[in-house]
């Protein structure tokens, strides 16, 4: 930083007894430059909201396909257990072995 004095050293007016002048003397300095950096700012952005909607659906029936009458397939009566699977003809578990009902709750496979 450089400074200079604009004060005049030439006598002003009649020669005084003291070495002084009636004009003000100001010390002037060059302008300064300051770089002010703002402090860091933390911004929190919300993350995605992950939702899961598990859907498990069971389709089937535990009731007989024939309501109010007796149903038979090949002279074999079909009960409640046999109504699931192969179109309600007393066969269940297609691909896992065929099972049906004989008479009153007797199951054959």
Swiss-Prot record:
GO terms for molecular function: structural constituent of cytoskeleton. This is Beta-keratin-related protein. Keywords: Acetylation, Keratin. One of its GO terms (cellular component) is intermediate filament. The lineage of its organism: Eukaryota, Metazoa, Chordata, Craniata, Vertebrata. The modification N-acetylserine is found at residue 2. Pfam families: Keratin (PF02422). Belongs to the avian keratin family.
């Amino acid at each position: 930083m450089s400074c200079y004095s604009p004060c005049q050293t030439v006598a002003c007016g009649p020669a005084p007894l003291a070495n002084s002048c009636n004009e003000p003397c100001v010390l002037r300095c060059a302008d300064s430059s300051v770089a002010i950096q703002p402090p860091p700012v933390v911004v929190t952005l919300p993350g995605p909201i992950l939702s899961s909607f598990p859907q498990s659906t069971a389709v089937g029936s535990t009731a007989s396909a024939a309501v109010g009458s007796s149903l038979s397939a090949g002279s074999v009566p079909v009960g409640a257990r046999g109504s699931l699977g192969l179109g309600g003809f007393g066969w269940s578990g297609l691909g896992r072995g065929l099972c049906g009902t004989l008479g009153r709750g007797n199951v054959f496979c």
